[in-house]
Amino acid sequence: RQKRFEKTLSFVKKHLKTDEAILDLGKTNKLSDFLRQNGYVNLANTSGEDLDVDFQIVTKYRAITAFQIFEHMFAPFNLLNSSEGKLIASVPLRLWFAKEYWNVNDRRDCHYHEFSIRQFNHLLERTGWKIKDYQLWKSYDKSWGIRPLLRRFYPRFYIVYAEKQILQADSEE
């Protein structure tokens, strides 16, 4: 986990200034705390609302991060379509040898979407985002077994930096 946090921080530093007001989708967690400890003091988290329905908060920010959030949303299209500015988002990639993640005891802890790179890119493009940079990371899981071994050879995480033109209201002449 620490290695993924450090790679995430490096990617964020490349694209967002530490003094920017940033909305991090999802409740406060170890990664958002790590980013704050490394200078991103204006990072705010959502408070656990259902972002499929209640996503208007994104319109108040021009920089949004979403670290492994969109796979948990039933309809991420709506939130992405409503937001503008800068976006850094990461998703775990669908792997041909692994079943989707589904926690039967907690409906919020399920993957409604297991994205391929092409699918995630298409989602961003359909909602007006232009991908400017991306990275692929392999899993650093030290567990034993066939799946953990295969995850060391196939990219497991996909992180993108994208921008969406902020639409200006037509001025009256």
Language-model features, listed with the residues they occupy:
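Short, glycine-/aromatic-enriched active-site segment of Class I SAM-dependent methyltransferases
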Residues: A89-H113
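Short N-terminal helix/helix-N-cap motif within the alpha/beta-hydrolase-1
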Residues: F74-N78, K99
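A structural motif corresponding to the C-terminal end of an alpha-helix
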Residues: L123-W129
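Active-site flanking residues adjacent to catalytic metal/cofactor-binding acidic residues
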Residues: L23, F67, A89
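A short beta-strand submotif of the Rossmann-like class I SAM-dependent methyltransferase core
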Residues: A63-I69
